[in-house]
């Protein structure tokens, strides 16, 4: 069995689709932890809808995605923990396909399908919809089944990922000192690699990712650019150099 950690903030419609696909798409009954990062009332209707199939961790004040992920992980009851975002859609049989791809001392990334070109060469680019409200989940499941391959390679290091509960803790989880949710994932995957974990990717399970939800004003975009740069600066302060990304296998290094 797997414990799933889904942090959520202000996207109840996306969360609804995410949970529907996770619950209806699973082969076994897994633990699904929804970490509500503030704004419980905004998400209350969706949480009530799936209350018999999820565990809710309600953080009354917004603490940010990094802290929310760590708290969700600490509350996992199974030895394998799957970290996923609320703007993902789960494929059919995601749980048994992930478990069959997992090996001890590894981190298994599920491949993704995205509607627009990506920096990650392994992703499948197919526009199956940009609107969560009108998304055809059955059409996605049929498409995903047609392109899924029983293949695993060492090109992991992206979300969503499956990891042993203790392995996550051994590398210190996600560093909560980062000034935002950028770069911290690069550091996490780098720490996993440095600790001897194999960074795998399975093509047996392909999750849909909406990429960017919500309206972003030019001011917000500029603000995020500054925060992202601050995250790079924090990494350099901590490690003595800026992070490097290998575009061929997604490996993160100094």
Language model segments and positions:
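Short beta-strand-to-loop acidic/aromatic patch adjacent to the donor-nucleotide binding site
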Residues: 78-89
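A recurrent flexible, glycine/aromatic-enriched loop bordering the glycosyltransferase active site
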Residues: 142-163
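A conserved acidic beta->alpha catalytic loop
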Residues: 36-45, 89
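Short, acidic, metal-binding catalytic loop of nucleotide-sugar glycosyltransferases
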Residues: 21-29
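Active-site donor/metal-binding and catalytic loop motifs
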Residues: 179, 201-220
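A short, conserved alpha-helix in the catalytic core of glycosyltransferases
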Residues: 156, 160-161, 167, 171, ...
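Glycine-rich, basic loop-to-helix element that forms the pyrophosphate-binding segment
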Residues: 59-76
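Conserved donor NDP-sugar-binding/catalytic core segment of glycosyltransferases
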Residues: 93-130
């Amino acid at each position: 069995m797997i414990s799933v950690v889904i942090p959520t903030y202000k996207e109840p419609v996306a969360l609804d689709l995410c949970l529907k696909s996770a619950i209806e798409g699973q082969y076994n009954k897994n633990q699904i932890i929804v970490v509500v990062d503030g704004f419980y009332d905004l998400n209350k209707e969706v949480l009530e809808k799936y209350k018999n199939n999820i565990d809710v961790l309600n953080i009354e004040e917004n603490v940010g995605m990094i802290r929310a992920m760590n708290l969700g992980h600490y509350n996992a009851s199974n030895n394998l923990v799957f970290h996923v975002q609320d703007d993902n859609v789960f494929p059919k049989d995601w749980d048994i396909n992930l478990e069959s791809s997992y090996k001890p001392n590894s981190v298994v990334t599920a491949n993704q399908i995205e509607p627009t070109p990506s920096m990650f060469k392994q992703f499948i680019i197919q526009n199956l919809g940009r609107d969560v409200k009108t998304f055809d989940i059955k059409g996605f499941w049929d498409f995903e089944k047609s392109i899924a391959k029983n293949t695993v390679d060492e090109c992991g290091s992206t979300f969503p990922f499956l990891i042993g509960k203790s392995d996550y803790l051994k590398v210190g989880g996600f560093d909560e000192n980062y000034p935002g949710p950028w770069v911290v994932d690069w550091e996490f995957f780098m720490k996993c690699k440095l600790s001897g974990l194999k960074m795998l990717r399975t093509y047996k399970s392909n999750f849909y990712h909406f990429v960017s939800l919500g309206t972003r004003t030019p001011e917000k975009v500029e603000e995020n650019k500054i925060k992202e740069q601050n995250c790079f600066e924090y990494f350099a302060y901590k490690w003595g150099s800026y992070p490097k990304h290998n575009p061929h296998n997604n490996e993160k290094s100094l």
